[in-house]
A protein has these predicted regions:
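Conserved N-terminal phosphate-binding loop of PLP-dependent enzymes in the Aspartate aminotransferase
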Residues: 1-168
């Protein structure tokens, strides 16, 4: 997960990180690398991901998945407009990449819906959850679309918490 974060406070002193990870800006005008308003930051960020995924000769020519927080956590709990996620969904569908949503900080009803991504009306291919689901217990999970989950052989992903009394 450290390869995915852009937070220097989490990366400093660790590494080397997994290769093949390309970062794109989150649509928050306050920290956006391009001079733009909040409304256009969401559109520009979505179009930039589409460009990375669907334009030949970019560094992202063989992307397996786009992983995104449905609500920016560490940057100030910023909810992007639904348009951003709709653009990501369309870009992933066009390129064949999976759209995986990180709901570790924002899921489990913390935004008024079970999952924050529901506010955008977008269905992800995968969803990561934790923190709020565990009620302060060490719980996390990953949910996939049923057609994708069926492709994973039984017991190919063992449970590393299996020996913990709380996990029984």
């Amino acid at each position: 997960s450290n390869a995915l974060t852009t937070g220097n406070q989490y990366r400093s002193g660790y590494g080397p990180f997994m290769g093949g990870v390309i970062h794109a800006p989150y649509p928050y005008a306050y920290r956006f690398p391009f001079d733009t308003s909040q409304k256009s930051a969401e559109r520009v960020a979505g179009e930039y991901v589409d460009y990375l995924l669907n334009t030949k000769y970019t560094a992202a020519d063989d992307v397996a998945a786009v992983i995104v927080e449905s609500l920016q956590g560490e940057g100030g709990y910023v909810p992007p407009a639904p348009e951003f996620f709709q653009l990501l969904r369309a870009a992933c569908d066009k390129s064949g990449a999976l759209l995986i949503v990180d709901e570790v900080q924002s899921g489990a009803g913390r935004t008024g819906k079970m999952w924050a991504i529901e506010h955008a009306g977008v269905k992800p291919d995968g969803l990561l959850f934790g923190k709020g689901m565990g009620g302060d217990l060490p719980m996390a999970g990953f949910v996939l679309r049923a057609d994708l989950a069926k492709k994973i052989p039984a017991m190919s992903q063992p449970n590393t918490f299996a020996a913990n009394a709380l996990s029984a």
